[in-house]
A protein has these predicted regions:
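Short acidic-hydrophobic, aromatic-tinged amphipathic segments that line or gate anion-handling sites
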Residues: 40-49
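Short glycine-rich anion-binding loops that position phosphate/pyrophosphate groups of nucleotides
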Residues: 62-65, 84-85, 110, 161
Length: 187
């Protein structure tokens, strides 16, 4: 959450969890901890409330069924699905996929072998493998155009790529060493 707030000026962040008390407590804690970013962080009453008029929808769940109604996603939204990394799990409602202008992954090969968010709709004939355009790297390198207009719905599916995790860990390690933080094991 903090990374998103640091990267982009967000006015309002709605959070939803099936456990209402946990959701409320998390929203309150994040409102205090992340106040410097100026966003209002509030618990949503349900997943539909959470995505209503949302420009950015981020799902981070281990769900085996969709966590929001894909027909309610507004034009121009970006959806980032982080939680489903197994073929039987899908937090993304397949109903949004035919409306999506672009479906991008961290790794197309990994996503097409690991996430039910794509495998289930492909098996059901809702989309094809060709509808999955490529990787985020392809967007960054200009092989695939990013957002081309304010009406596009863009879906980003991430299953995790070990090489990216290692690079991130190395950057964090180097910064910790430079700042004199942490400790060395075995010394």
């Amino acid at each position: 959450l903090e990374a998103m707030l640091a990267a982009r000026k967000l006015e309002e962040v709605k959070i939803f969890d099936l456990n209402e008390e946990r959701c409320k407590a998390f929203a309150e804690e994040m409102q205090k901890e992340l106040a410097k970013y100026g966003a209002t962080i509030i618990p949503a009453k349900d997943s539909d409330d959470c995505i209503e008029d949302a420009d950015l929808i981020v799902t981070v769940t281990p769900s085996a069924k969709p966590v929001f109604d894909g027909t309610k996603v507004k034009a121009g939204a970006t959806i980032s699905c982080v939680g489903t990394y197994e073929p039987h799990k899908h937090e993304l409602d397949p109903a949004v996929l035919p409306r999506a202008s672009k479906i991008i992954c961290d790794s197309k090969e990994a996503a097409l072998s690991e996430t039910g968010d794509l495998l289930i709709p492909i098996a059901d004939g809702i989309i094809t493998e060709e509808d999955v355009l490529g990787s985020l790297g392809d967007v960054i390198n200009g092989k695939i155009k990013g957002r081309e207009n304010d009406e596009e719905i863009i879906v980003y599916e991430t299953v995790g790529v070990a090489a990216q995790d290692l690079v991130a860990a190395k950057v964090i390690y180097d910064k910790a060493v430079e700042a004199g933080k942490g400790f060395r094991w075995g010394e």
